[in-house]
Amino acid sequence: MRAGGFDSKTMENLAISVIFIVVLLAVGGFIVADLFTTLGAYTPTVSQNNPLYNATTSVIHGMQSLGGLFSSSIGLITILIIIAIVSVIIVLLRTSFSSGGTGS
């Protein structure tokens, strides 16, 4: 470890974590937007007597809630915090396993 507190392995893990967060948010955003559009176009064509109607409307309501979570600033901050915590845990587990479990 260098005097600044970061070595090359720490910076590599940090860079991987940042890339992981950005890719996860981008892919998640595309999936949510595309699925919501597809189900929104499909639901009016289904009869209310069809069992799929309840399934698709419940999925659409869930997607609307998820979209609201992504569109609000507090929801986006919450998602970023959760992703950051998971990334840090993954990095810590990787470094502890690669060093033989001693943590140094």
Curated annotation (Swiss-Prot):
GO cellular component annotations of the record: virion component
Keywords: Virion
Subcellular location: Virion
Source species, domain of life: Viruses
Protein name, entry field: Structural protein ORF104b
